[in-house]
């Protein structure tokens, strides 16, 4: 070890007796400081303008344009300048012969050289660390462990670059060639992860070799053993190759022996890398303050209940618009989207089944008129150069699974302990399911589901249609991730006039019947309520009399006419509601609604008699005067203003009572439109939040899965504008000048000697 340290010390002296080391240090210092403090300055100005800050540590250091993310993209440019002369300088000057003929072991020479460059790279990390220290005094409650995780990841990355540069320096006596060769190898390692991803086994090898994004997890606050070991193994590989290369100059070796040594090293490194990257052997350390990179507590409680094999099968329709997400070349990325779960469930098995069938990909059919599904599939295989072991025809896939209800879209099934559920892709920017959707699917396999049944037969709102007034978006839209069918609920319909309510029903919804309920329907609903089951009743001013036999049983009624308010911008029946004050949280827990919840044409809820239900208003009209009027008026007339008005009229009420050992829950609303397709899609509305809270309550807070995390505490820049500016100047100008002065002093002093 002493020899290694002596060589490292000598190499460091040589490096710092060259202007290159000082210039690189100055450029790195200016570049990193400029990036960080320029961003900090912009956020400080935004904060002064009243913009809320959130999670500032992650925003400034990671993300799309944080300090560590940006510097990761530039580190590869610095390393070749530092490593190009490590060995090539010795080869060019002839001193390599003296080294090889000395009693010093080759491994000591190589390790000493690597230790020197690794020591120099610590200066890069020291600069980033100083920026982190300054951030500690600028940001309230800076997440220190998060910053340290990022620095650790970047250090491993730059040391791996250095090991590669060291090996390339062994191959040539020309320093420029060594630098260029290093850049070429680094580019290759960044690109190799995209090669041959459609070939089994080979794709795992190339994916392992890829250095692209390897430090991302650590930059984002998650230290993963397979990434740490990757950097160590790749560094070991190139250090070993460097030792073998220099040994050929000292020892006479046959070609076969050389090949065997190189092959053995490469195979050993690849084997170790493959083994240690498997899920059961991967370990994690979440360095974020709020464990952002780990499953939430609710999700962890779900996965704890899974103790056996679990299989995820992705059915990929070649004609679907999302087909590429399940192709062989995308599978490694697809596996990565389940990393949070494989951490706790290493036994997850993922399979892919490919088929073709009629799809909803309208553009594909427009662009290829006259081709049937089989011809389209053949064309896709040919033009996209897709190679599949098996592509099922419509007839063949239908024998395996019926995907017609899923519109033949790319979809997954999750199977555990004999139960199966769907996990879908969605028509939004991200497409893939997130923790909320994945955990909901898993919970359906280990816990009872919540079944919502809609009453039909009296022209009620439909969960199958897309019109503005219908209910498909919130309940039964498979392409919308927030629809309840994708959040753990089962949704069905029955003809209430002819069919009994299923025994397993958890919530019965009667939404705006436009004709009178039959006596049979009234009796069925009455018996259902008497059993202590949950109900949601939604009426409209013109048709709510159809619900009177039910609401009367509950001791409630509707106002006789539509509620209206005077407004300069909206129609009179456009009501801006308010969440009722002081709602008892033991009755229902509502999240804070940040946006108004509009009601377009609503009746008020009245109490007609005392019952054993506890009645809790949830939404009311605001504090403006409200009158009753016939529907369809264009303005509030002077005559109407003379009529008695009211304020804070209940529009949605919750009824609760203890029965059969559990709490019965009922919602009655004077407006059936407020959870319609159109209203749930309205921008700037709090309707969807309220809608979700209500059904979370109905499910006893089991679904949707609560994936909220503790609020971040690093939400404020505590440094003033002047302090940020002074710190910026210190790091961008004064600190680099000090480095230049130190470098100049050392270089001049050496020249004088």
Model-derived segments and spans:
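Hydrophobic alpha-helical transmembrane segments
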Residues: 1-78, 82, 247, 251
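Extracellular ligand-binding/catalytic regions of CAZymes and related secreted enzymes
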Residues: 252-280, 286-311, 435-451, 459, ...
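Acidic, S/T/G-rich, low-cysteine, solvent-exposed domains in lumenal/extracellular/periplasmic regions
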Residues: 472-703
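Secretory targeting signals
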Residues: 34-37, 55-72, 111-172
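Terminal transmembrane helical anchor/hairpin motif
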Residues: 39-62, 178-252, 618, 633
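Pore- or pathway-lining transmembrane helices of multi-pass membrane proteins that form conduits
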Residues: 20-30, 175-190
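Juxtamembrane extramembrane loops of integral membrane proteins
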Residues: 278-416, 422-431, 435-441, 449-500, ...
